[in-house]
C-alpha cells in the first residue's frame, strides 16, 4: 500500500543545508536522508509518466505558465542550470517535461531528451538548447505551430534540485507573422488541459513590473482554481520595477493584493544583456543573491525565504513532494479502478484473431458455440438479462396473455347481447319446430361466427411474437458477432430466412386449427359437465333474485334459454382450447423450432473452411480498439507493479 505520510514536511533540502556551516559528514548524512525520502517520490511519478500513464490518469505535477516575455524560460533555466530555446514569438511549442535529478557532489552532469519514441543522450549542457529546438521541429514542424506531444528533458547534476516541472507555451493574444490565426485559442486549450487537473500545481510566472490583475496567465489559473489552493505566483524582473512602486511588489509577494493560498515567490534571472554578455547561470545566481541582499525593499523578502532561485527550488521541491504524498493513495485507487474497467472492456472485444488455419477453426467454433448456447438459453427462458430488461419468454408470455384476454372478451358478451343475437337467429332460421324446441342450426351458426372472428387476431399475434423473437435473436447476434461484420451479416440473414419459413408454417397451422374449429365438437362427458355447471349457475342466480317478473317478461321462448345455456357451455370449452392451442403452435414453430434450426444452420458454417477468413474478418475500429485497450492495460499493470514496490 502507498501511504501519504512520509515525513517530508519536516525534511530540509540539501540545497538549504549546503549554505550553512555543517561539516562534510553532516552534509552527507542529510543528503542520504534527502535521497531516501524525496527521490523515490519524484522518481515514482516520473516513471509512471514515462510509462504513459498520464494518457489514462492525471499525475501530480507542477505546470509552469505565463504570458509571453514573462521570464518563464529564464526561471526554468535558473532552476535547471541549462539554456533553453529563446527568441521572439512562440519559443515553447510543445509541452516540455523538465525532470531534474540531484546527484552527489562527485557525480558528473548527465542529460537526455526523449520524444516520439526517441531517446537522445546529451553529452554536454551546452547542447540542450539545440536538441530541444530540433525535437520541437520534429514534432510541430518548421514555423510557429504548436503540438500537444510531450518532450521530456532529463537533467542530472549536483547543482539542480530534485524536481519535475512541465513547461507550457507562453500565452499570446495576437497572431503575428506566419502564426495560425487561432494561435491564442490553441495555446490556451493546451494550457487548460494541464491546469484543469486537480493533481496539478499551477506555477504562474508574472513580471513584477506589470499590474498583476491584468495578466492572462493568472486569470486562467484563477478560472480553474478560484480559491488559489494549488497556485503559486512567481514574480520576475524585480530590477525593472519603477522606483516608488517597490512596496506594491512587496505587498503582492506577501499575499496582500491577489490572494493565493500557496502564496508568491520573487526571483531575478538573467536579462537579455546578461545573456548577450554570456553570463553563466552560476554567476547569475550569485548576482541575484547580492541584488536582494542589497535592495532596501526586497531584502526582507529574502530573509522571509520568499526570494531567489535557490529558495524557489527548495519551495517547489517541498510542494511537489507534499502534493505527491497527498495524492498517491487516490492515484493508487484510480489506477486499480481503471485497470479493472479496462480489463472488463477488453473482454468485450475478445482475443486477437489467430493466424493459423486450425486455430481459426477453433476460434470460429468457440464464437458460434457461445452464440448457440445463448440462443438455446433464450428459447428456454434461462438467458441472463440486465436489471431493467425482460427475458424473451416473459415478453412472449405477455403477448399470450393479451391473446387470452381477446378470446375471453370475444366470448364474454352480456346476457342481453347474446339473447338478442339468439332471438334474431330464431326469427330468421327457425323451421318447422314448435316453440321450446332447440334449433341446432341456430346454435352451430352462432358458434362458428364467434370462432371465425378470432382467426385474424391469432395471425396478428403470431406476427407480433415472431418479430419479438427475431429482434431478440438479432440482438444476440450483435452481442456476439458485432465486431465481425461478415459473420454478423450471415447470422442475420439466417435469422431472417428461418423466421420466414417458421412463421409460414405456424400461420398454416393456426389457420388449419380455425378450420377445424368450424366443426362444432366436444367430448360428451366434457360438454355435459360444462352444461351442468352453466345450468347450476343460472339456477343459483334465479334463486337469488327477489322477483323474476322482469326476467320472465324478457324471455318469452323456452328455446332461447336452452340455446343460451348450450352456447355458454360450448364457449367455455372452445375458449380454453383456442387460448391454449394457438400459443402452443407459436411456441413450437417460431420459438423452439426457430431456435433449433438457427443453431443447426450456424453450425453448418463450419463446413466451409474457405470462408473462415471472410467470416472472422474484424472491423478495423475493433482491431484498433483492442490494441489500444491492451496498451492501456499493460501501462496500468506496470504502474500497479511500481506502486506496489514503492517503499511508502
Curated annotation (Swiss-Prot):
Keywords assigned by UniProt, alphabetized: Acetylation, Antiviral defense, Cytoplasm, Endoplasmic reticulum, GTP-binding, Immunity, Innate immunity, Membrane, Nucleotide-binding, Nucleus, Ubl conjugation
Region (G1 motif): 66-73
UniProt induction comment: By type I and type III interferons.
GO MF annotations, alphabetized: GTP binding; GTPase activity; microtubule binding
CDD domains: DLP_1
Region (G4 motif): 236-239
Keyword Endoplasmic reticulum: yes
Expression across tissues: Ubiquitously expressed.
Region described as Critical for lipid-binding: spans on this chain: 543-546
Region (G3 motif): 167-170
Residue ranges of the region described as Stalk: 356-618
GO biological process: defense response to virus; innate immune response; negative regulation of viral genome replication; receptor internalization; response to type I interferon; response to type III interferon; response to virus; synaptic vesicle budding from presynaptic endocytic zone membrane
Ranges where the GED domain occurs: 560-648
Quaternary structure note: Homooligomer. Oligomerizes into multimeric filamentous or ring-like structures by virtue of its stalk domain. Oligomerization is critical for GTPase activity, protein stability, and recognition of viral target structures. Interacts with TRPC1, TRPC3, TRPC4, TRPC5, TRPC6 and TRPC7. Interacts with HSPA5. Interacts with TUBB/TUBB5. Interacts with DDX39A and DDX39B.
Function, as annotated: Interferon-induced dynamin-like GTPase with antiviral activity against rabies virus (RABV), vesicular stomatitis virus (VSV) and murine pneumonia virus (MPV). Isoform 1 but not isoform 2 shows antiviral activity against vesicular stomatitis virus (VSV).
Protein name per its UniProtKB record: Interferon-induced GTP-binding protein Mx1
Organism: Bos taurus (Bovine)
Amino acid at each position: 500500500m502507498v501511504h501519504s505520510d512520509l515525513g517530508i514536511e519536516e525534511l530540509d533540502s540539501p540545497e538549504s543545508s549546503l549554505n550553512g556551516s555543517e561539516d562534510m559528514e553532516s552534509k552527507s548524512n542529510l543528503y542520504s536522508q534527502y535521497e531516501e525520502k524525496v527521490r523515490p517520490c519524484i522518481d515514482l511519478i516520473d516513471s509512471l509518466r514515462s510509462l504513459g500513464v498520464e494518457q489514462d490518469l492525471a499525475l501530480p505535477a507542477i505546470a509552469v505558465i505565463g504570458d509571453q516575455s514573462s521570464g518563464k524560460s529564464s526561471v526554468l533555466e535558473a532552476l535547471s542550470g541549462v539554456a533553453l530555446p529563446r527568441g521572439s514569438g512562440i519559443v515553447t511549442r510543445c509541452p516540455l517535461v523538465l525532470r531534474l535529478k540531484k546527484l552527489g557532489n562527485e557525480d558528473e552532469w548527465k542529460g537526455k531528451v526523449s520524444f516520439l519514441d526517441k531517446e537522445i543522450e546529451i553529452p554536454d549542457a551546452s547542447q540542450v538548447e539545440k536538441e530541444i529546438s530540433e525535437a520541437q521541429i520534429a514534432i510541430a514542424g518548421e514555423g510557429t505551430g504548436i503540438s500537444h506531444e510531450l518532450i521530456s528533458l532529463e537533467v542530472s547534476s549536483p547543482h539542480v534540485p530534485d524536481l519535475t516541472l512541465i513547461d507550457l507555451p507562453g500565452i499570446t493574444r495576437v497572431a503575428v507573422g506566419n502564426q495560425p490565426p487561432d494561435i491564442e485559442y490553441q495555446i490556451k486549450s493546451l494550457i487548460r488541459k494541464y491546469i484543469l487537473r486537480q493533481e496539478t500545481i499551477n506555477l504562474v510566472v508574472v513580471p513584477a513590473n506589470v499590474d498583476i490583475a491584468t495578466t492572462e496567465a493568472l486569470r486562467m489559473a484563477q478560472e480553474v482554481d478560484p480559491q488559489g489552493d494549488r497556485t503559486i505566483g512567481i514574480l520576475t524582473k524585480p530590477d525593472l520595477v519603477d522606483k516608488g512602486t517597490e512596496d506594491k511588489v512587496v505587498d503582492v509577494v506577501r499575499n496582500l493584493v491577489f490572494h493565493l493560498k500557496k502564496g508568491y515567490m520573487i526571483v531575478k534571472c538573467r536579462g537579455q544583456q546578461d545573456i548577450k554578455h554570456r553570463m553563466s547561470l552560476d554567476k547569475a545566481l550569485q548576482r541575484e543573491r547580492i541584488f536582494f541582499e542589497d535592495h532596501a525593499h526586497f531584502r526582507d523578502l529574502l530573509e522571509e525565504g520568499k526570494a531567489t532561485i535557490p529558495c524557489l527550488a527548495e519551495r517547489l521541491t517541498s510542494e511537489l513532494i507534499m502534493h505527491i504524498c497527498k495524492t498517491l493513495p487516490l492515484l493508487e485507487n484510480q489506477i486499480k479502478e481503471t485497470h479493472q474497467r479496462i480489463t472488463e472492456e477488453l473482454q468485450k472485444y475478445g482475443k486477437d484473431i489467430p493466424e493459423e488455419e486450425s486455430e481459426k477453426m477453433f476460434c470460429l467454433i468457440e464464437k458460434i458455440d457461445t452464440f448457440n448456447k445463448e440462443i438455446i438459453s433464450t428459447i428456454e427462458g434461462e438467458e441472463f438479462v440486465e436489471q431493467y430488461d425482460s427475458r424473451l419468454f416473459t415478453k412472449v408470455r405477455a403477448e399470450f396473455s393479451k391473446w387470452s384476454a381477446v378470446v375471453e372478451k370475444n366470448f364474454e358478451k352480456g346476457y342481453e347481447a347474446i339473447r338478442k343475437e339468439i332471438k334474431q337467429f330464431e326469427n330468421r332460421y327457425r323451421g318447422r319446430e314448435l316453440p321450446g324446441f332447440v334449433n341446432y342450426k341456430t346454435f352451430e351458426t352462432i358458434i362458428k361466427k364467434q370462432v371465425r372472428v378470432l382467426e385474424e387476431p391469432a395471425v396478428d399475434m403470431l406476427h407480433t411474437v415472431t418479430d419479438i423473437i427475431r429482434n431478440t435473436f438479432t440482438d444476440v447476434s450483435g452481442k456476439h458477432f458485432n465486431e465481425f461484420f461478415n459473420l454478423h451479416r450471415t447470422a442475420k440473414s439466417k435469422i431472417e430466412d428461418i423466421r420466414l419459413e417458421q412463421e409460414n408454417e405456424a400461420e398454416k397451422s393456426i389457420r388449419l386449427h380455425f378450420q377445424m374449429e368450424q366443426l362444432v365438437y366436444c367430448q360428451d362427458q366434457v360438454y355435459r359437465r360444462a352444461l351442468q355447471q352453466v345450468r347450476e349457475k343460472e339456477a343459483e342466480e334465479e334463486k337469488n333474485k327477489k322477483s323474476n317478473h322482469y326476467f320472465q317478461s324478457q324471455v318469452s321462448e323456452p328455446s332461447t334459454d336452452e340455446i343460451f345455456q348450450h352456447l355458454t357451455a360450448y364457449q367455455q370449452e372452445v375458449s380454453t382450447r383456442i387460448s391454449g392451442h394457438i400459443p402452443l403452435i407459436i411456441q413450437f414453430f417460431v420459438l423452439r423450432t426457430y431456435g433449433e434450426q438457427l443453431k443447426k444452420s450456424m453450425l453448418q458454417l463450419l463446413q466451409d473452411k474457405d470462408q473462415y477468413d471472410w467470416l472472422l474478418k474484424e472491423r478495423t475500429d475493433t482491431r484498433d480498439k483492442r490494441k489500444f485497450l491492451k496498451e492501456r492495460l499493460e501501462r496500468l499493470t506496470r504502474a500497479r507493479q511500481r506502486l506496489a514496490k514503492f517503499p511508502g
